[in-house]
Design a protein with these regions (language model features):
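Non-catalytic, low-complexity flexible loops and terminal extensions
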Residues: 1-6, 16-19, 107, 119-207, ...
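Acyl-thioester-dependent condensation/acyltransferase catalytic cores
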Residues: 32-130, 134-137
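Secondary-structure boundary elements
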Residues: 105-108, 134-143, 211-217, 227-238
């Protein structure tokens, strides 16, 4: 069975890499078995992408086994080199949409898991990591499920006036066809910053958020908004901070928390609002806005899928023209947006595993649109941040200044007497991507 990629799936062209550092040992045959079992569970990992004259197609249940490349681990930072390679390596048409690299040494290993962003978001990738690590030492059954299709997401939804939706889609399709295609590919000059916050500051921030009745995510939104405004100024401020919403977690009956999925809702918060308001008062307002937006997104998802099915995929040449247009117009951020993703407290390893999870990192690369985003997550009691941006969206100097201002602002909310950039206990590492 096969189906054509939707317009959104065609546009989301990029790779995700997760690196897990494991202290302990396991055998190659056990790793291959773990990858195979996880692949058998998830329909998206058994698909291939075929290129036909009229577009891209998913072909189900025909992918070969997950490729595993084994590399001797000679130095602690070898994963950076391999992650860079894997981020930019296009998935071959005859290979699974998951591949693995094992940087092996006697007592410690780095495992890279790589997938296409078309089938997988950050939370889905954590599911893959969790299941692979579990399967390395457990024979617990992984139960397959049916592919998640647009039809399932739409359900019994019907718009009140279908002709209006069809007319709108027809006009949009016509407008997109007028965009000339570009034969050359824009080079994305992405770079990344990574930093960890000490357990003491992480815990203090969590307690402060709880006391103030504000989610950690709402606090991060306010801090990012105000820091970004200070660094780039009002004229260059992206109009929106956009956060992906996990449509699983019991919110949609068709989706279970352990299913691979990409394409849920997103929460868009306008930047530069209520700047005179005290930080935590603004945080409570944002917190309530997020609650309302989540409820509304859950109602809107079926209709959005219905409309997306009416859209025609945009060719890569036209996407490149759109990217160049954005460059020429000096659009703020990534098409006037900055993405903020919060993966929450990451727990992927079992206490009874014969190895210990020492580290987990993630990396993202886009093959078409320019990236600008910040990912937050907590691991082993430490809050961590991964910033990725294209130089045309934010310069390296601006990104470093944003990091310092962002962290100083968070520190100030926890301890106003020591709220400067040098006061917080921070472990930082910059990685060119």
């Amino acid at each position: 069975m096969r189906r054509k990629l939707s317009a959104i799936e065609c546009m989301i062209d990029g790779n995700i890499v997760y690196m897990v550092r494991l202290e302990g040992s396991f055998q190659e045959d056990r790793l291959r078995s773990a990858l195979a079992r996880v692949q058998r569970k998830h329909p998206a990992l058994r698909m291939l992408i075929r290129k036909e004259r009229d577009g891209l197609y998913y072909e189900e249940d025909c992918a070969p086994e997950v490729p595993l490349r084994i590399v001797p681990r000679m130095a602690e930072d070898d994963y950076q080199r391999e992650s860079y390679v894997e981020l930019r390596k296009v998935f071959a048409v005859d290979q699974s949409l998951l591949r693995a690299v094992w940087l092996h040494s006697e007592f410690e290993s780095d495992l890279l898991l790589v997938t296409s962003h078309r089938i997988c978001d950050g939370m889905s990738m954590l599911t893959i990591v969790r299941e692979v690590l579990r399967a390395l030492h457990s024979d617990e059954e992984l139960v397959p499920y049916e592919p998640i299709s647009a039809k399932i997401m739409i359900g019994d939804y019907q718009p009140q006036h279908p002709w209006k939706r069809k007319l709108m889609a027809s006009l949009l399709n016509g407008a997109l066809r007028l965009i000339p295609g570009s034969s050359s590919t824009s080079e994305n000059n992405e770079y990344a910053l990574e930093w960890n916050v000490s357990p003491s500051l992480t815990e203090a921030l969590k307690l402060k958020c709880k006391t103030e009745g504000v989610s950690v995510h709402a606090a991060l939104v306010v801090a990012l908004d105000r820091s970004l405004l200070k660094i780039v100024g009002k004229k260059k401020l992206p109009g929106w901070i956009e956060s992906p919403m996990d449509a699983r977690r019991g919110r949609l009956a068709a989706l279970k928390s352990d299913m691979l999925f990409f394409g849920g809702g997103s929460l868009k918060m306008r930047t530069g609002q209520a700047l005179e308001e005290e930080f935590w008062a603004r945080g409570r307002a944002v917190n309530e806005d997020i609650r309302r937006m989540v409820d509304q997104e859950m109602l809107d998802i079926p209709g959005r899928y219905y409309f997306n099915e009416l859209l025609r995929p945009v060719s890569n040449g036209r996407i490149q023209t759109m990217v160049r247009l954005g460059d020429a117009l000096h659009v703020n951020g990534s098409w006037n947006r900055l993405a903020l993703s919060n993966l929450g407290n990451v727990i992927v390893n079992d206490s009874d595993a014969p190895f210990r999870l020492k580290d987990l990192r993630l990396y993202v690369h886009s093959f078409n649109f320019r990236l600008l985003g910040l990912v937050a997550y907590a691991l082993n009691g430490e809050m961590r941040f991964y910033y990725v941006g294209d130089e045309k969206c934010l310069s390296r100097a601006q990104a470093n200044a944003l990091k310092q201002e962002f962290m100083a602002l968070l520190q100030h909310q926890v301890d106003p007497l020591n709220g400067d950039a040098k006061a917080f206990p921070l472990v930082t590492a910059a990685v060119a991507q």
